[in-house]
Amino acid sequence: MKTDLKLTRDLRITFSVDTPDHGRVHVHSLPLARSIFETFVLELGETYSKVFGSYDPKHVAMTAPQMALPALRAVAKRMGTWDGAGGLEVGLINELARLTNVAHAGPGGWEQLPIHLAHQRGILDDDTHAEVLSSLVFFFLTLRVGPDVLREDTLRMASSARGWQYTSLGFTEYLASLPTSTPVASTTKKRSSVIG
């Protein structure tokens, strides 16, 4: 994965999380469209102010990814825009989930699922699912709401602390870049026991 990529608004985020029952899983998410930002600009702006209120960038990089989704939910509920067909839960969180895939080690190699199926099937428990979504909300807030001058530093610090990577790869190409999830068969020749 390239580490010298320019952090543009069309980058994808990838990271790994350790799950209680399924070991390490890999998350890959596409960026949300600008239209999502424009639809929920008031809620996102207020959430950004709450989550990024600290002047210490290290504090923001360490704590903000866990606070982003709960803060966004609280802001939207207070504004009356969380629930319903046009609400933030459907319009932003469900769209974020639609753009996010999970890879976990299965018997035949990496198995890929949309994040909502990984959650429904228990690959991501409730806490891990919420942690992943909150990290993705933080990433989106940083890319779309934050000023350009802070974006790169914030994402570099967060990625350093959390093992995040940013890529231009699609999910299939990202999976191909992962280490093999099944044991590789030995290719050493065995000595023949046939005599004569």
Regions found by a protein language model. Name each.
Residues 1-35, 42:
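Short N-terminal edge-element motif at the start of the domain
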